[in-house]
């Protein structure tokens, strides 16, 4: 499936890791954004986020809060847009502006705008604070008393906006009963602030003759990530917003920024990557860099792509919140592609492949907590489809209430479980393993213990599997077997470390060893199905039967050279060109095959795709 470019960049974190001195870690443009996906810059604190257009005469900020979902435990629904903020400046639209620059500083989590117009220097700053749970937008002119603006708020679901006491706010209720609210507080230095209506008759705030404007935005719902309270928080969204905004107002913009930068850099600065920073001109726009890259690869730009991926994961996934979805947390539609959901057949897992290796283990926690919180609903749904089994699994499309749709992705929960083990493998926290991860690893292993079928010859196979979005439904699909193998391996290791359930560990070990082994076909390929039907002309984007190469470790060049050779044949036949996320997966495949040149070739192809005019 296709996906948004921000999601694809999240996946590219798997390719590199290193340390260095400070580098050029920013995106740069010399004109305002006009397109949401390809030009606006994202900010986020893991819960709320925005896309900044940075227009000169009119500012447009489209914002989100990642729990605003339709649907419930039965219906999947979709992730929703939250609202839009407009700041219309009182300036002649025909007046030219010069020295325009908009910069997304990845090393600070700070978006900055600067330009000159009518003899004035205009500066803006934007950031999303995790410690204070607000977004902050600051507007300043070099000439005092010259800042005039109209500030308008808009609900993506059409509720009326209220204005009072220097605040704009709206609140509403979705069809599923979810309550939501957003509020903007306007702080004016110098000048005056008044309520009025715009040309459409909507309530707005007018700022006259100000030196500086600071906008504080908070958005919230009454969602809670626990089934025990029926997914509801006891605190009303309006009260949540008021609590955050009142505290933020006490700090002031400079202290808010200092607190934000300290929090953000504590994560971002854990990794630096030095690929010859001297190659980059500090004034060269990102688009110009991408155009230059088409002619000659620029390693420093590759480092920038890597750090942009880390920025996006930090901005869309923080402890205590929901995981990054198909679009991170940025979404401007109430009917987004694929619901902007949690796809269990690679996409949500791929979002988190980088979390541990890119030294962002704190950003892994939303995904781990999500897996845990969905268990009870998934057990109910699983019993309806697979009566009598223990444990649980998932369908392909998933929401934040346990609701799901499309086809069953039967090994999906086992793939989820890999992240539980990886978090232990990187951090060696036995308390976490014992109390959090192990019970989930065991119950998913129990699902497959009950689900697997033993043939007369003793071989064990997974029944009625489907290689994602490709081919027939039948027994012994390679995708199923490789993920089950990975699950059982991780369970066995966890049980051994904790010295728990010795007899059951022996049982699972025997079951793992009896699984149908990977098969090599007539043209030397690794078979996608037990039947040798692979087509050497097939260029399908999913390469699910290579899970055991990456992110699994069932086969490798050193351990299983024949299977590694067959994987190489399969990859060569599938080709290098594909959707962005598929290309990122292929980078990892070729790296595991110890072919760095081929991995690098696909990486350069991907970056050239990013730099194209038609980005999907």
Role assignments for model-derived ranges:
Residues 23-405, 417, 422-424, 442-445, ...:
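Aromatic-residue-lined binding/catalytic grooves and analogous aromatic/hydrophobic interfacial grooves
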Residues 347, 409-423, 429, 433-450, ...:
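Extended, hydrophobic alpha-helical segments in both membrane/secreted and soluble proteins
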Residues 462-494:
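C-terminal, helix-dominated tail/subdomain
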Residues 599-611:
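Substrate-recognition/cap regions that form aromatic- and gly/pro-loop-enriched pockets
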């Amino acid at each position: 499936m296709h996906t948004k470019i921000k999601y694809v960049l999240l996946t590219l974190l798997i390719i590199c890791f290193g340390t260095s001195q400070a580098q050029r870690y920013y995106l740069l443009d010399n004109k305002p954004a006009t397109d949401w996906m390809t030009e606006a810059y994202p900010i986020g604190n893991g819960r709320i986020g925005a896309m900044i257009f940075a227009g000169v005469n009119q500012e447009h900020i489209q914002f989100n809060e990642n729990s605003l979902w339709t649907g419930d435990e039965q219906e999947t629904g979709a992730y929703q847009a939250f609202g839009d903020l407009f700041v219309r400046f009182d300036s002649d639209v025909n007046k030219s502006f010069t020295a325009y620059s908009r910069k997304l500083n990845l090393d600070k989590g700070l978006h900055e705008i600067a330009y000159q117009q009518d003899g004035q220097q205009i500066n803006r700053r934007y950031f999303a604070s995790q410690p204070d749970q607000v977004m902050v937008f600051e507007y300043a002119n070099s000439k005092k008393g010259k800042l005039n603006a109209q500030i308008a708020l808009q609900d993506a679901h059409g509720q009326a906006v209220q204005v009072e006491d220097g605040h704009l706010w709206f609140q509403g209720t979705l069809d599923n009963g979810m309550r939501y609210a957003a509020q903007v507080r306007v702080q004016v230095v110098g000048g005056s602030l008044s309520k009025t209506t715009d040309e459409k008759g909507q309530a707005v705030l007018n700022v006259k003759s100000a030196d500086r404007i600071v906008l504080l935005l908070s958005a919230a719902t009454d969602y809670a990530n626990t089934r025990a309270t029926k997914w509801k928080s006891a605190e009303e969204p309006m009260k949540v917003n008021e609590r955050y905004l009142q505290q933020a107002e006490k700090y002031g913009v400079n202290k808010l920024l200092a607190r934000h930068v300290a929090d953000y850099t504590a994560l971002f600065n854990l990794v630096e990557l030095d690929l010859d920073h001297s190659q980059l001109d500090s004034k060269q726009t990102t688009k110009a860099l991408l155009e230059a890259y088409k002619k000659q690869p620029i390693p420093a730009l590759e480092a920038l792509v890597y750090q942009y991926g880390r920025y996006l994961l930090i901005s869309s996934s923080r402890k205590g919140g929901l995981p990054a979805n198909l679009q991170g947390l940025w979404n401007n539609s109430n009917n987004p592609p694929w619901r902007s959901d949690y796809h269990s057949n690679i996409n949500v897992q791929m979002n988190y492949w980088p979390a541990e290796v890119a030294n962002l283990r704190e950003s892994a926690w939303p995904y781990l907590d999500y897996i845990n919180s969905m268990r009870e609903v998934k057990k109910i749904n699983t019993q309806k489809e697979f009566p009598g089994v223990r444990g649980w699994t998932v369908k392909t499309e998933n929401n934040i209430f346990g609701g799901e749709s499309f086809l069953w992705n039967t090994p999906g929960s086992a793939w989820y479980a890999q992240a539980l083990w990886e978090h232990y493998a990187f951090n060696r926290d036995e308390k976490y393993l014992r109390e959090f991860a192990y019970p989930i690893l065991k119950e998913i292993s129990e699902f497959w213990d009950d689900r697997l079928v033993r043939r007369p010859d003793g071989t064990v196979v997974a029944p009625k599997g489907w290689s994602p979005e490709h081919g027939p439904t039948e027994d012994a699909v390679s995708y199923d077997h490789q993920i089950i193998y990975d699950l059982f391996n991780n369970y066995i290791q966890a049980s051994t470390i904790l010295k728990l359930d010795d007899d059951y560990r022996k049982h699972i070990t025997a079951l793992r060893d009896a699984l149908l082994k990977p098969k090599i076909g007539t043209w030397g390929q690794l078979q996608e199905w037990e039947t040798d039907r692979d087509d050497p002309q097939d260029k399908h984007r999913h390469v699910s039967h290579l899970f055991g190469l990456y992110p699994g470790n069932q086969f490798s060049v050193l351990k299983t050279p024949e299977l590694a050779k067959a994987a190489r044949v399969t990859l060569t036949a599938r080709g290098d060109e594909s959707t962005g996320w598929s290309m990122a997966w292929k980078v990892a495949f070729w790296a595991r095959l110890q072919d760095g040149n081929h991995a690098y070739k696909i990486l350069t192809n991907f970056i050239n795709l990013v730099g194209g005019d038609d980005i999907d």
